[in-house]
Amino acid sequence: MSSGGLLLLLGLLTLWEVLTPISSKDRPKFCELPADTGPCKAIFQAFYYHPVHRTCLKFIYGGCEGNANNFKTIDECKRTCAA
């Protein structure tokens, strides 16, 4: 195979890796946890991964405790958990 063909193949494989969604076995376990507002009474907009809908959704976070399925931005949620 020519060097041009190898570069094309490498580029296609790289693109495939970037565009392939995270599989459920590679997703962190905390992404399966339910949204948890925690016991505090603040009102912060946050995002959590919803495993049934396979997307990130908004929820209100109280500001303390809760769990790890809690992200400040939807992009952070998607990068970490979304398939």
Swiss-Prot record:
Q: Which GO terms describe its molecular function?
A: serine-type endopeptidase inhibitor activity
Task: Report the principal subcellular site.
Answer: secreted
Could you tell me what this protein does?
A: Serine protease inhibitor.
Q: What is this protein called?
A: Kunitz-type serine protease inhibitor superbin-2
Q: List the disulfide bonds.
A: C31-C81, C40-C64, C56-C77
**Record has Secreted as a keyword:** yes
Which residues are the signal sequence here?
A: 1-24
Localization (cell): Secreted
Residues carrying the site annotation Reactive bond for trypsin: K41, A42
An example GO CC term for this entry is: extracellular space
* Tissue occurrence: Expressed by the venom gland.
> What UniProt keywords apply to this chain's record, in alphabetical order?
Disulfide bond, Protease inhibitor, Secreted, Serine protease inhibitor, Signal
The superkingdom listed in its UniProt entry is Eukaryota
The answer to whether UniProt assigns keyword Secreted to this entry is yes
